[in-house]
């Protein structure tokens, strides 16, 4: 038998039988790529730094660090070989330090020594195979993802989910809807807007799709997550989080595994974090252990306002903070918080007193209940270095709710406390002032139990709903007209010494929900769920008429604008401008009188539509304005001019006849203006235009006229 004949024989069964374990003898070695390139004189210094860095996960053998050098250049090659005491330590090093930032300019790639040989063999195999150029997908232009902001009339959009149909429509006056897009079976369950309105998300059995642009087609991108149920965006739209109630299962077929972006470490996980730029998963998480009878809290992963950090808690145990750039645990360890119940990020970066004015921080707050002899605690923490800014110890605590002011300047923790007999409860409001030195705390003690509290956007005023029936053994909904609605304002004229004072409290109000306008000032109170109430109450905190309620020194003039009705209301949402508000009755809640209504901020009905199997309404969010403070001021000063333009547009939309007449007048005026400009130019060229006289050539003529205003005759005797 010749050598050529031997080449045709299949030895795969023998190779498999006598295969050598590549890890045997090398299991405790790792190879580090991306280390700093140094001259030979700095070898000892780099070895010491590497030993300290990699020694965090296990003991490195004596002389267990080898740094190879290039003889031609006399410098290191950027590789480092490290030997640990055990293979488990080496495996931990790969898991902890792969793709880890070593310093500002160096990111490390860490692999086992045996894996390097395996990848080299795969490369040699690929070299012998014929190269097949991968198919390049044709570029499809999506159009500008914020094209709706260029609408000449500055209108907002909203999405309607009716039966199996989903459509995006313009908010306009009139009876007919103007659709931007309207499609059958666009989603299998729900649709979601991203925080700034860039994307509309549709959910499907195989995953989610993101839509946008002027044409709404094709989908911008797809994310594969079977049986996805919940979707969440980070505030800056850098990350997308999906959750499925079914753990992730990898296919058995090797070819199918290559088509999905998941590996063995992701199997069994239910939460996936996606990078919207790369469209790849950055990390997967398992669900935290569930307590019996406890419902799932969403979102599970919460992001800082700048998308720099993300945090999640293991209920009752710890709080884990991650750096989103690598999705690695900050400082490689979690914050131990025995009994932790809830946490919330400040909605904006906070400028802490005593720090540089330009330096802003991501701050979060969490609370733990009373456990044994340990008091309940509210903790304020700076995320970057886990510095505790303020701790507040509390006693006899039944529950806490965290309420951040939207600019992060104030934090209110609503503390429900029980009496010593534990038969009734009352509420304390604990106010933290983050922009003052030491984060002082102000306590407002109330006799009633506060059921809801809401800060005014961009302001320091707030509103509470409370009730005097504070028995702890009553779980049902309160009877109608048992709530007290209270308005509070801060004494601004006293500066940092000012406290929050009551403006006015209204008893026997039938409401459980508070909805502030996005721009503040206007408020709607309503009863949602658990009641047949149909009333919406509209309030103005800065009424321009006479003051009726509250201290004259408080920065508020409260006025009740009126009530409106919507039977079976299940949700309410303001539009981004704060001029309109939508209420709707969802088929998902009940099956009677489904539909939606749109009101203006004063409670005047603008549009009403009853729709069978109506499911959801949602305004399209807008990104933060790019206008400067001066530009905003100029717009406010010229509101009358803008109002005339919009009134003209409204008149044109009122009827086709009015539209044609206004357009004709506008065209004739433009033609006359153009003719007049052309004529003046010709006269000027011919020298027939008399120059305007200088100011000194003007003659001032004064005329004195006597006018008889009244003629009276008096008879003197």
From Swiss-Prot:
What terms describe the molecular function in GO for this protein? identical protein binding; RNA binding; translation initiation factor activity; translation initiation factor binding
Location(s), subcellular: Cytoplasm
Cellular component GO terms held in the UniProt record? cytoplasmic stress granule; eukaryotic 43S preinitiation complex; eukaryotic 48S preinitiation complex; eukaryotic translation initiation factor 3 complex; eukaryotic translation initiation factor 3 complex, eIF3e; eukaryotic translation initiation factor 3 complex, eIF3m; multi-eIF complex
Query: Some GO term, biological process aspect, for this entry: which one?
Result: translational initiation
* Protein origin, superkingdom: Eukaryota
Q: Where are the WD repeats?
A: 183-221, 223-284, 293-332, 445-484, 506-549, 564-609
Q: Which family does it belong to?
A: Belongs to the eIF-3 subunit B family.
Protein name in the entry: Eukaryotic translation initiation factor 3 subunit B
Give the gene that encodes this protein: PRT1
